[in-house]
């Protein structure tokens, strides 16, 4: 079984953790941007069918 020879430094650990956090931040930002464009109707990646509020008589 492969075992690391030395302990990972706190400096490297912090860098890796920040990279991981930044990926989550960008994913959340993209999701929020997409939701915003869908709600305003300016989305270019989704085709949303608009339902009219007509009553059947």
UniProtKB/Swiss-Prot annotation:
Its main location: plastid. It comes from the Eukaryota. It is found in: Plastid, Chloroplast. The keyword Chloroplast applies. One of its GO terms (biological process) is translation. Keywords: Chloroplast, Plastid, Ribonucleoprotein, Ribosomal protein. InterPro entries: Ribosomal_bL32 (IPR002677), Ribosomal_bL32_plant/cyanobact (IPR044958), Ribosomal_zn-bd (IPR011332). Component of the chloroplast large ribosomal subunit (LSU). Mature 70S chloroplast ribosomes of higher plants consist of a small (30S) and a large (50S) subunit. The 30S small subunit contains 1 molecule of ribosomal RNA (16S rRNA) and 24 different proteins. The 50S large subunit contains 3 rRNA molecules (23S, 5S and 4.5S rRNA) and 33 different proteins. Component of the chloroplast ribosome (chloro-ribosome), a dedicated translation machinery responsible for the synthesis of chloroplast genome-encoded proteins, including proteins of the transcription and translation machinery and components of the photosynthetic apparatus. Belongs to the bacterial ribosomal protein bL32 family. This is Large ribosomal subunit protein bL32c. It comes from Spinacia oleracea. The lineage of its organism: Eukaryota, Viridiplantae, Streptophyta, Embryophyta, Tracheophyta.
């Amino acid at each position: 079984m492969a075992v690391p020879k030395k302990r990972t430094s706190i400096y490297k650990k912090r860098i890796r953790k920040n990279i991981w956090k930044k990926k989550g931040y960008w994913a959340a930002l993209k999701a929020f941007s997409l939701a915003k464009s869908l709600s305003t109707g300016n989305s270019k990646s989704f085709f949303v069918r608009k339902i009219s509020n007509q009553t059947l008589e």
